[in-house]
């Protein structure tokens, strides 16, 4: 009983010393939670009053907003939690920074573990009690205004528990920093290091791999790790995932955080027990931690300095890397020693650690610079590869990627989606392409030792060679994933690409439509230049149509995709995005389905629909621009300029407008739409220096539209070449 009374008495005394923290916490929650809640409710009432009769979904929208505000995704509560955790963590054990106060506290006849528990528990209560009070106030406000339902109540409780867990994580990390240091300023710096160190290391690693390895592929996991290796970033990321309903993933993450919190509490308690009283006022509380922390900071900071100077220099010269390494090494080492000793004269104290850091930095840089582990030329043994996933750059650029499993944040980079959802069980062609990519890497490295990226050309013949990016994920038998990116010439690998493209396993990962359910799609419409029609389909018809389209997509070859122009575009509307898919003339069942529902799937632009074709030679424009640098316009030098004669526009030099049917009939088969070209630009050859603008009549009432086109390579009619002075 005496022990219990002493515990409570010490707890009350500690609370008296921390009244300012309590006031700050209460004020923060009241202003940024309760008051903001009242403001939001007032805004909701105004919206209902002004928009209720016009918007039938306004109440549902307000309900979702209330859930978001009271739930884990409330950004203001997250900020309060972070600030309160840092403040309470740093201020709770403030007496450890004063020798007199340390002697006073440690003279109390109470075990250190109990002193630690008192201060730790008070820091938790300073957060929990104001949060609970203001959560109840928010419940009352919402209830009075008829926004309080069971879902809102449970969402608030979920947020309460979730925020407490991450408060404990951030709070305990700050306490560990205090235990390791003996000065408030150093404690603050140490806390910042602990919060950011993981993200910093992952970022440095990613930057070096990206800078030095030609085949390095940065995927979603890297970006995610940079965020989540910081407890602050992990907090925000997990809050978003809860709102998006990740289920079992969240449970596993929360369990891992709880285990980490328990380990950190045990570690902090151990440090408090072992912390010498004379550590007060010193930079570091434990001598053994000084070199460990010093090396853990100096080495990555030096690497960051080197890559920073190298990146700033346009030449990416290795000399700037070396300069940056040395500069950052000396400066960071000196600053840390000054902090350790509180003496500028000891900036280079412990020269052996400085030399050791320099050696470690040099070894790491040499590993990257000379690829000592053969990262760029490594390829798993084919017998060890379970499946391969690939993403081919410059192909089907119109495809939009979205993962319905990830709710509102499902948007993703196209290669990430394909690599995550594709499993090619017959890896032969994909594996052969990877080997060709490695040979390309070796060729580049043998010619250009100071390479920066895979886009350096090997020889003069390669200047006119078209390359595509080839991203690969090897999934090994042990479930390990290996990612690589290669740049490969089109001409010598086209046959292998055709084999990959026709593989159903490839298409299932390349086209997201294969992963859809009919209920993912709200509506389906179809459009061309002449018509835009939205279909009224039930779930069975939507499912039937999607299956029809996928079946025809299965049989579509790479040759078809890049050489046959589509006749129409399908638009699949979901809750989040609209997705476009092309209808090709060979998709007979798809076209029949569209025709049966009143859309002409065979209607294309014919020469009879074309009002005029305007052609411009960009080379002439470039010559004109070059002349203007010297004060001479092209019109002056050739005495030709755009003018009108009796109201008729005269084409200037390098341009020509064709309106006669004979010319149009000869030009139109030789051009392709600009958007179709850009969708597959790597695999289609066009005359890029010539712009073609086609004016198309879209009805019988003189309404027209204009579209950009390109001439196919080597198919420009002779009379056009003469008319625009094309060389």
Tell what function each PLM region has.
Residues 4, 40-69, 196-271, 275-288, ...:
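Terminal transmembrane helical anchor/hairpin motif
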Residues 350-357, 367-727:
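Function-determining sites in protein domains
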Residues 1-26:
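Aromatic- and glycine-rich beta-strand/loop motifs that create alpha-glucan
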Residues 185-198, 326, 349-361:
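Central hydrophobic cores of alpha-helical transmembrane segments
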Residues 67, 71-74, 122-182, 186, ...:
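Secretory targeting signals
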Residues 72-101, 120:
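Long, hydrophobic alpha-helical segments
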Residues 295-301, 334-376:
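Internal/C-terminal transmembrane anchor helices
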């Amino acid at each position: 009983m005496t022990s219990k009374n002493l515990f409570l008495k010490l707890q009350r005394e500690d609370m008296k010393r921390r009244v300012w923290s309590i006031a700050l916490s209460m004020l923060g929650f009241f202003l940024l939670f309760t008051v903001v809640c009242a403001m939001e409710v007032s805004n909701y009432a105004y919206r209902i009053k002004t928009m209720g009769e016009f918007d039938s979904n306004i109440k549902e929208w307000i309900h979702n907003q209330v859930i978001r505000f009271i739930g884990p995704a409330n950004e203001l509560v997250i900020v309060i939690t972070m600030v309160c955790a840092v403040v309470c963590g740093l201020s709770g054990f403030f007496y450890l920074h004063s020798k007199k106060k340390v002697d006073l506290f440690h003279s109390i006849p109470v075990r250190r573990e109990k002193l630690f528990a008192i201060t730790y528990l008070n820091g938790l209560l300073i957060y929990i009690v104001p949060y609970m009070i203001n959560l109840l106030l928010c419940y009352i406000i919402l209830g009075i205004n008829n926004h309080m339902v069971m879902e809102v109540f449970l969402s608030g409780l979920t947020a309460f528990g979730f925020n407490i867990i991450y408060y404990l994580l951030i709070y305990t990390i700050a306490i560990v920093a205090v235990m390791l240091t003996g000065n408030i300023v150093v404690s603050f710096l140490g806390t910042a290091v602990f919060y950011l160190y993981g993200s910093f290391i992952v970022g440095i690693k990613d930057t070096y791999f990206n800078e030095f390895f030609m085949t390095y592929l940065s995927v979603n996991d890297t970006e995610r790790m940079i965020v989540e290796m910081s407890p602050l970033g992990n907090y925000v990321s997990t809050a978003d995932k809860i709102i998006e309903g990740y289920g079992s993933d969240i449970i596993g993450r929360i369990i891992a955080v709880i285990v980490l919190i328990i380990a950190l509490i045990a570690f902090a308690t151990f440090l408090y027990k072992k912390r010498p009283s004379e550590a007060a006022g010193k930079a570091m509380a434990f001598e053994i931690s000084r070199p460990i922390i010093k090396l853990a900071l100096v080495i990555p900071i030096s690497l960051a300095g080197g890559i920073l100077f190298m990146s700033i220099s346009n030449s990416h010269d290795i000399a700037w890397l070396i300069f940056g390494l040395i500069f950052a090494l000396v400066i960071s080492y000196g600053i840390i020693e000054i902090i350790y000793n509180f003496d500028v004269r000891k900036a280079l104290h412990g020269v052996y650690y400085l030399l050791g850091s320099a050696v470690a930095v040099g070894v790491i840089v040499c590993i990257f610079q000379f690829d000592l582990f053969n990262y760029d030329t490594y390829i798993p043994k084919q017998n060890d590869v379970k499946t391969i996933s690939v993403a081919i750059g410059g192909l089907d650029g119109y495809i939009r990627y979205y993962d319905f499993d990830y709710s509102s944040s499902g948007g993703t980079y196209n290669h990430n989606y394909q690599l995550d959802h594709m499993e090619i069980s017959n890896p032969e062609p994909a594996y052969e392409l990877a080997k060709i990519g490695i040979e390309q890497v070796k060729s580049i490295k043998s010619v250009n030792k100071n390479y920066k990226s895979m886009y350096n050309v090997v020889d003069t013949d390669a200047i006119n060679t078209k390359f595509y990016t080839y991203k690969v994920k090897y999934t090994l038998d042990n479930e390990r994933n290996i990612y690589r990116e290669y740049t490969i010439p089109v001409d010598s690998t086209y046959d292998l690409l055709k084999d990959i493209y026709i593989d159903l396993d490839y298409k299932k990962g390349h086209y997201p439509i294969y992963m859809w359910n009919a209920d993912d799609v709200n509506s389906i419409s179809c459009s061309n230049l002449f018509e835009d029609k939205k279909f009224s389909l039930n779930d069975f018809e939507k499912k039937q149509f999607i299956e029809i389209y996928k079946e025809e997509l299965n049989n579509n070859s790479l040759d078809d995709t890049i050489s046959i122009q589509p006749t129409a575009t399908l638009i699949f509307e979901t809750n989040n995005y609209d997705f476009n898919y092309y209808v090709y003339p060979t998709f007979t069942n798809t076209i029949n389905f569209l025709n049966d529902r009143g859309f002409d799937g065979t209607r294309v632009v014919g020469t009879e629909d074309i009002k005029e074709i305007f052609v411009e030679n960009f080379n002439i424009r470039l010559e004109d621009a070059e002349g203007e640098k010297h004060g001479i316009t092209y019109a002056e030098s050739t005495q030709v300029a755009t003018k009108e004669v009796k109201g008729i526009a005269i084409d200037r030099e390098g341009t020509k407008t064709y309106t006669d049917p004979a010319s149009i009939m000869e030009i139109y088969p030789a051009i392709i739409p600009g958007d179709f070209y850009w969708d597959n630009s790597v695999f289609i050859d066009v005359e890029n220096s010539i712009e073609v603008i086609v004016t198309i009549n879209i009805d019988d009432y003189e309404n027209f539209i204009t579209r950009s086109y390109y001439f196919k390579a080597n198919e420009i009619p002779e009379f056009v070449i003469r008319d625009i002075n094309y060389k």
